[in-house]
């Protein structure tokens, strides 16, 4: 039997774009979670993470880029969503809390 306590997934909004407008609760959650997951563009940009970095020191955190396909093909979408879910689940199963930034 697996005795590892599962991590918790936290959905965290970084607000409208200005780090100074992030809520205190969002900042506190990001500070406390060892893993930060955020959508990443095909060009490699992680806007939600960039905004969070303006309010929180993320050094020492595990950064988990999530790739969500921009496609109308439902199979492509399902595959990209499953890959993102699997990546997050691996950390949760290892007992690490994850903040999903958006």
What residue spans do the PLM features occupy?
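Class I S-adenosyl-L-methionine
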Residues: 1-19, 24-102
């Amino acid at each position: 039997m697996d005795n590892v306590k599962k991590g918790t997934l936290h959905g965290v909004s970084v607000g409208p774009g200005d780090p100074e407008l992030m809520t205190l609760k969002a900042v506190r959650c990001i500070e406390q979670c060892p893993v930060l997951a955020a959508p990443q563009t095909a060009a490699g940009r992680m806007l939600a993470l960039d905004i969070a970095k303006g309010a929180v020191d993320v050094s020492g955190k595990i950064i988990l880029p999530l790739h969500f396909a921009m496609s109308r093909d439902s199979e492509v979408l399902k595959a990209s969503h499953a890959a993102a879910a699997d990546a997050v689940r691996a950390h949760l199963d290892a007992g690490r809390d994850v903040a999903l930034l958006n």
